[in-house]
Amino acid sequence: MAKEWGYASHNGPDHWHELYPIAKGDNQSPIELHTKDIKHDPSLQPWSASYDPGSAKTILNNGKTCRVVFDDTYDRSMLRGGPLSGPYRLRQFHLHWGSSDDHGSEHTVDGVKYAAELHLVHWNPKYNTFGEALKQPDGIAVVGIFLKIGREKGEFQILLDALDKIKTKGKEAPFTHFDPSCLFPACRDYWTYHGSFTTPPCEECIVWLLLKEPMTVSSDQMAKLRSLFSSAENEPPVPLVGNWRPPQPVKGRVVRASFK
């Protein structure tokens, strides 16, 4: 029971509820999106992000993903609009990916799995701290972007070039002057629903904005992401791959689309 969660058979998503009961809750993420069942909601606004590149601080390998951390001590890098009631502060972004190009995303669209999924995590500063926001149904807003295989994305390469400094679990390196909006697709259409973090403790505090249009990266770029290790420097090497949670039951939740 007292084991660290992970993605292996003995500590993977099927076991998370043993340590974190909410992982079997009614508002868990990710989910399967069935576009024929999703209604367009004309009241949904466009969303916008104004990110300060100077707020990017570090990149780290925590053994579960690679994460870029931002300064969120004041309103520097903000997400607004869409289904949100007010502005949200960017705290970090991270990725989920598979062991090969044909899977790796957490959400699926009409059965399609993408090669990876990028999550930009923001919190609602009306709750004063990130920790307080985690306890509120509208505490967190995550922009999810699918990665599909195609031509190389130059802006993504900036991130990948930093991975050599964080090959193994526990490594952290400076990562500054980066505006993640350079990764956004041209089309801002999105789906939205109420869900949870896709990693333990799986708190159900998230307003999801899932972008319809994926970001295109090359197969070589995905291979670079898979060159990370989930093991520490002094341990036998274990590749960091397959860090995705499968879709969870929708349980009557409504998914809305910002587009027809």
Curated annotation (Swiss-Prot):
PROSITE patterns documented for this protein: ALPHA_CA_1, ALPHA_CA_2
Sites bearing Phosphoserine, chain numbering: 29, 43, 48, 50, 55, 219
Example of a GO cellular component annotation carried by this entry: cytosol
Regulation of its activity: Inhibited by acetazolamide.
Source domain of life: Eukaryota
EC nos: 4.2.1.1
Chain positions covered by the region annotation Involved in proton transfer: 64-67
Domain Alpha-carbonic anhydrase: start-end pairs: 3-259
Expression by tissue: Expressed at lower levels in adipose tissue from animals that were either genetically obese or had experimentally induced obesity.
Modified residues annotated as N-acetylalanine in this record: 2
Signal peptide annotation: none
Enzyme class per UniProt: lyase
Source organism per UniProt: Mus musculus (Mouse)
Record Pfam families: Carb_anhydrase (PF00194)
Residues recorded with modification S-glutathionyl cysteine: 182, 187
Residues binding substrate, per UniProt: 198-199
Keywords linked to the UniProt accession: Acetylation, Cytoplasm, Glutathionylation, Lyase, Metal-binding, Phosphoprotein, Zinc
Protein name as annotated: Carbonic anhydrase 3
